[in-house]
Amino acid sequence: MKLSQFKFKLPEEKIALHPTKYRDESRLMVLHKRTGEIEHKMFKDILNYFDDKDVFVFNDTKVFPARLYGNKEKTGARIEVFLLRELNEELRLWDVLVDPARKIRIGNKLYFGDDDSMVAEVIDNTTSRGRTLRFLYDGPHDEFKKALYALGETPLPHTILNRPVEEEDAERFQSIFAKNEGAVTAPTASLHFSRELMKRMEIKGIDFAYITLHAGLGNFRDIDVEDLTKHKMDSEQMFVTEEAVKIVNRAKDLGKNVCAVGTTVMRAIESTVSTDGHLKEYEGWTNKFIFPPYDFTVANAMVSNFHMPLSTLLMIVAAFGGYDQVMDAYHIALKEGYRFGTYGDAMLILDK
C-alpha cells in the first residue's frame, strides 16, 4: 500500500484539546467488520458487546514526565530536552532528543531547575536531534530519578495537542491501570476506561490481561516513504507475561472474544505468536509495522482512538477493520462530529 492512501482532510477544530469530563463518556463508534454496519454509542456502552469469559488486553505502561526545559551553559539559551530512555543507571546516562539541536554539541553542559540544581553533560550525538546525556548527580539512583522527574512535565504530543500542559494532564494522560514506567506517550485507547466501567466489566465476567509496551515517539514520526514496505518502525520495549498468555490463550481455546485495547497492544501481541496461533511469553523489543493487508492471529476485536492522517496508528486500524471500511468510517466520524487525537473519541471494531 501507499502512504498517500491514508491521507484525509482533518480540520484542526476536530482535534480534541481536552478529555471529556468522565473517562467513559467519550463517544464510541462501533464498526461491525463483516456487515459494515456502524453504530454510534457512548464509550461506557462497550460493555454490551462482550460476555462472560471474553478478554480485554490492556497495555499497563506508565508515562513518565519526559519533557524538560533548561538552559545552556554560558549563553543561557533556553533548550528543550525530551527524555527517551535511561541507558545506564549507574552512570546516569540517558538517550534524549534536544531542541534546538544545532546549538547543543558534545561537551556542552545543560542546566535544569530554577536553581540549576540538575546538570547534564552532552557526551554523544546519536541522530540529528538525538544526544546521550550524562547527568552529574551524586546520591542514590531513586533520589536522582525523583529529582529528575520533578523537573519534567507531562509529554503531551505537541504535533496533536498544540497547547500548554495543564495540571489535569498528569492524571488524564495516564490510564487508571498504568503501572510499569517507561512510556513517553500514553496508549490512548486505554484512557477511556474508568474504574466504574472496569468494575461493571468484571461483574459481567469479562477477564483482563495486561501486557507492557513502552510507547515511544516513533508513533508520531512522519513516514518519509510512499511505499510502506520500505518504512522502518522505531523499536519499543515490550513484555508479555506468562499470566497474560494463560488468560488470552484460554479465551481463544474456548472460542471467546479477545479485544486488543489500542494499537500498542495489537502490535505487541502480534509480535509474539506461536505457529498454532497462540500468544507466547516474550521480553524484548519489537519494531513490527502493521499495515493492510495483514492477517491477525490473536485478537478478533479492537478499540482505538481516531488517529491522524498518514499515521502508522491509522494503518494498524485499517489493517484490522479493512481499509475501505475504516476510511469510510473516518469520513463518517468527521461528519458526525467525533473528536480526533489523543484526547478524542474511540472506535470499537468487531469481527462480526
Swiss-Prot record:
- Whether S-adenosyl-L-methionine counts among this entry's keywords is yes
Return the similarity comment: Belongs to the QueA family.
Catalyzed reaction equations: 7-aminomethyl-7-carbaguanosine(34) in tRNA + S-adenosyl-L-methionine = epoxyqueuosine(34) in tRNA + adenine + L-methionine + 2 H(+)
EC no. given is: 2.4.99.17
Q: Name one GO cellular component term.
A: cytoplasm
- Which pathway, metabolic or otherwise, does it act in? tRNA modification; tRNA-queuosine biosynthesis
Task of the protein:
Transfers and isomerizes the ribose moiety from AdoMet to the 7-aminomethyl group of 7-deazaguanine (preQ1-tRNA) to give epoxyqueuosine (oQ-tRNA).
Q: Which domain of life is it from?
A: Bacteria
Name assigned to this protein: S-adenosylmethionine:tRNA ribosyltransferase-isomerase
Gene encoding the protein: queA
Q: Which UniProt keywords apply?
A: Cytoplasm, Queuosine biosynthesis, S-adenosyl-L-methionine, Transferase
The record's Pfam families line, in alphabetical order, gives: Queuosine_synth
Q: Which GO terms describe its molecular function?
A: S-adenosylmethionine:tRNA ribosyltransferase-isomerase activity
